[in-house]
Every structure is written in C-alpha cells, then in structure tokens.
Design a protein with these regions (language model features):
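Conserved catalytic network of the ASCE P-loop NTPase/AAA+ motor domain
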Residues: 24-27, 45-49, 91-93
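Ras-like small GTPase catalytic G-domain
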Residues: 51, 61-63, 71-91, 106-107
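ATP-dependent small-molecule kinase phosphotransfer cores
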Residues: 1-32, 38-42
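Structural signal for short hydrophobic segments within the conserved structured cores
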Residues: 5-6, 52, 98
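NTP-dependent small-molecule kinase module
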Residues: 73, 91-139
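Conserved phosphate-donor/acceptor-positioning beta-strand/loop module used by diverse small-molecule
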Residues: 32-37, 46-70, 102
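Conserved AAA+ ATPase "sensor/coupling" helix adjacent to the nucleotide-binding pocket
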Residues: 1-5, 67-74, 115-118
Length: 139
C-alpha cells in the first residue's frame, strides 16, 4: 500500500507527505498547501491533475544567505550547501504555475492568498462546489 504522496531527502533528513492525510483533507474539500521541492511538486501534480504550484523566490541569493545566517541554526558549510541546493531548485522554476518573491513576508503571503482565491473562483471549480445552485439557476 502506498503510504506517501511524495517523499524526499533534504539536508540529510527524510521528509514525506502522508497520502491518508491528503485524502482526508480532499474528502472535506479543503485546500491543501504543501511545502516541497520541485520533485515533490512534480509528484503531486502527477497524482492530482488540478494541483497548482507556486515557487517562492528569495529577493536575492545574498538576502537568502543573510536569512539563513540570522536563524543561527546552521554551520557555514550547511549554509553553503543550502544555497547550492536553492540555486539548483531555482533552475526548475519554469515547471511551476506561479512565482512570488518573498522580499516582504506579508506581500508574498498576500500573493499566495490571491492565487488560491483566483484558482478557487475558476469556473470548473465553481461548477463543482456550487453545482446545485448553478443547475437551479440555469434550468
């Protein structure tokens, strides 16, 4: 039995997304947000054809490095490795549906909210969520 929607090794740790959790959220028609690398996003899109993907870019590599150092959690070598991984991730940006730049957190968050709202308002999604109302109004 498949237990994970996607899994990946990142920074020496194994991460994954429980398929049961995703199915439960889907059953109650909840939007699901995943924080995954480009390979995870690719796996999710293969499993859920209507999934959308948003790539969150740093404003610059210098700013990303500053943020990693400010956390105070990683060694210099780990920070260098994370920056290298970030560059590799960014080389796959064209596979994503949307891009936002996380210069100011609240601005990036607002971008993400707008993207989700716009996707939910697409006709195909409204036809699913408001099927009875639409049928009643169009008959």
């Amino acid at each position: 039995k498949r237990q994970f929607l996607e899994s990946a090794r990142c920074h020496g740790e194994l991460y994954g997304t429980s398929l049961d959790f995703v199915k439960q959220a889907q059953d109650i028609r909840k939007d699901i947000i995943f924080e995954v690398d480009w390979q995870g996003a690719d796996s999710i899109k293969k499993f859920f054809k209507n999934a959308i993907s948003i790539f969150i870019l740093p404003p610059s590599l210098k700013k990303l490095e500053e943020r990693l150092k400010a956390r105070g959690q990683d060694s210099e070598d780990t920070i260098k490795a994370r920056l290298s991984e970030a560059k590799s991730e960014m080389s796959h940006i064209e596979k994503f549906d949307y891009v936002t730049i996380n210069d100011k957190f609240n601005d990036a968050l607002e971008d993400i909210k707008v993207i989700i709202m716009a996707e939910n308002l697409k006709t195909k999604n409204q036809m699913i969520h408001h099927n009875q109302l639409i049928e009643k109004l169009t008959k």
